[in-house]
């Protein structure tokens, strides 16, 4: 299976809680024989959708950045897309939202894929991820994707907290069982 993992934390790799989940997922998926490509949205040349409709929802996008030149070709070939984000004000990071908005340029061509959501948050209330999950579920429905699972790391406000939680194992097992 071809998998694209999109990370979106602006924190350094070794400090990020959501990238930790992405790394653990990748470890499991790679060991299971899957081909994994990781795109770091926070440290790439990306531009937001301008809504100009030059792509006519069928590409290409007017922006010739890392989304168009690197990520989009990989996404079009992928069977599974993994969206990873720290929770920022009860939603996805701005870095991931920039990527999601650019799905517009290939809406129809991205239909039919599987997807996974992985997110981390400091807060541990049971409602912490509700708005993010609602957004993701709506995206899955609109894009005609199949939700392949979620890892919602509540109470993971630091790298140490996520490393000592159950969520890393959950992410790795999710990758291994694909």
Which role fits each region the language model picked out?
Residues 1-84, 90-101, 105, 168-178:
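N-terminal beta1-alpha1-beta2 submodule of the flavodoxin-like/Rossmannoid cofactor-binding fold
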Residues 10-13, 88-89, 122-126, 156-159:
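Short histidine/acidic/glycine/proline-rich micro-motifs that form metal-
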Residues 14-17, 127-130, 160-165:
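Short, solvent-exposed loop/turn segments at secondary-structure boundaries
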Residues 94, 107-150:
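Short, glycine-/small-residue-rich phosphate/pyrophosphate-handling segment
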Residues 69, 130, 134, 165-169:
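Generic alpha-helical secondary structure signal
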Residues 6-7, 84, 117-121, 151-153:
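Short beta-strands and strand-loop turn motifs
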Residues 136-154, 158, 162-165, 172, ...:
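A charged, well-structured terminal subsegment
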Residues 67, 99, 117-118, 133, ...:
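Residue-level signal for alpha-helical context at structural boundaries
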């Amino acid at each position: 299976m071809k998998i694209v993992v999109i990370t979106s934390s602006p924190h350094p790799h070794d400090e990020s809680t959501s990238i930790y989940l992405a790394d653990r997922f990748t470890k499991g998926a790679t060991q299971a024989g899957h081909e994994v490509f990781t795109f770091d949205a926070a440290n790439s040349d990306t531009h937001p959708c301008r809504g100009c409709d030059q792509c006519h929802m069928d590409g290409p996008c007017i922006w010739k950045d890392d989304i168009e030149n690197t990520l989009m070709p990989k996404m079009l070939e992928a069977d599974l897309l993994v969206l990873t984000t720290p929770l920022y004000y009860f939603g996805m990071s701005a870095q991931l939202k920039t990527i999601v908005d650019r799905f517009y340029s290939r809406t129809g061509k991205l239909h039919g894929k599987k997807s996974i959501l992985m997110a981390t948050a400091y807060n541990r209330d049971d409602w912490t991820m509700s708005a993010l999950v609602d957004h993701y579920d709506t995206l899955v429905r609109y894009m005609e994707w199949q939700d392949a699972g979620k890892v919602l790391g509540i109470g993971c406000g630091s790298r140490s907290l996520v490393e000592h939680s159950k969520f890393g194992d959950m992410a790795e097992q999710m990758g291994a069982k694909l």
